[in-house]
């Protein structure tokens, strides 16, 4: 458990909390280990960072936003954005994917190598598409549609900006 909660959401009679954050001074992180804490009104459960690292070969940290949905087969899908590590996906509380510049249109800030895939502002539209912001890049709005296809939008007033938050 953590006393460093950064985002909280209530969905499906559960409460989901993530520690994390982002710096306003330009450095990459607060170095908060990425866990997802879930309270189902009876008990707490935690999706531990070590499990994510072992399964996805990426250390999760500096989470910035969380959204929860269900897929067509009623499996719980959790998406968590990170300020440096991209977008994490959990299916039925198991780490299933991390999206970054190697496997999606998500970009690293200013084309830097390493852990600069700065994602925030997760939100679903009424069709079930996942929208997000991608800071300090040429196309600041990214969309993962319900079919699993990625789309990028260029919004001149947002492109290249630091710490874009919610959509």
Where does each model-flagged region fall?
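Carboxylate-rich, polar loop motifs that coordinate divalent cations or form catalytic acidic clusters
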Residues: 1-167
